[in-house]
Amino acid sequence: MAYFRNLFATNPRPKFWLKTFLHLLTPGGFGYIRKLRAGRDRSYVHERDKHEVRYKHHGGGGWKSEKQGGLVKRDYVSYEEYLTHQKLKLDEMVKMKGGFSNFDIFDYRLKFYVRFRQLAKLLPFDAAILCCGARQGTEVDVLRDLGFCNARGIDLNPGPDNPLVNVGDMMKLDDPDNSLDLLYSNCIDHAFDLDQMIAEHSRALKPDGYLLYDIGVNMEGGGGPFEAISWDRTEDVVLRLLHKFRAVIRIERESQWLWVLVQGKQSD
């Protein structure tokens, strides 16, 4: 019930709600999702047609045997192998089923709305916001619907002609030092190196900027086909953030996520 109270709290956004239900009810998908849906390849057979890197890297295979700092990492032989593997996720989703379903996008929009509506108390609407690993851009779209006009996304593979997300690497941002007001990601389990990624995100944030991560829970059984790292305890990730940031603004746990908002990067 608390989820729905948050969902329908004050300050409604008509544009957000209209687009949310268009995503749910439009046959064949709405907006950019419709373009992705058209890319479904009914002749594609995964076991026959999958990329060679997927023979090594899948849900149960391609992982290192030992843990490091509470983390299990994929056994990539090079950064190029990592990039190749990560770029395949969207391609496979589109070929096999046309990307996310209408209900998936509807559900993601509601979850992002609950997350991001809190930000209006902390940031001006012209804040510089970067969403890392944004794929088709649902989180960017919701931020803009909430009034954050300078929200943008990056992804290794954002799909063709994506109006919301540019090609970019969350491990190696193009953004200058001290330039972002907020950085958001819900794909930190796709990092090549978690500590290096946090340091890179900290670098690009302004001294009093915010970092918002969705941290996957219930990962004791390991990651899925495309996760690059997994952890048994979310605390191991949160502690890494506390070493880099001065203040925890908010922590909230959901069934699949622990979302953590921190502010104020530590001086090196």
What positions do the PLM features span?
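Class I SAM-dependent methyltransferase SAM/SAH-binding core
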Residues: A128-K172
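A short acidic, Gly/Pro-enriched loop at the edge of an enzyme's catalytic core
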Residues: M171-L183
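A short glycine-rich, Lys/Arg-flanked "PGG" loop and its adjoining helix->strand segment in the class I
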Residues: D195-Y210
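Conserved Class I S-adenosyl-L-methionine
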Residues: N218, G223-E252
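Conserved beta-strand signature within the Rossmann-like core of class I S-adenosyl-L-methionine
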Residues: D208-N218
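Class I SAM-dependent methyltransferase Rossmann-like catalytic core
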Residues: D41-P124
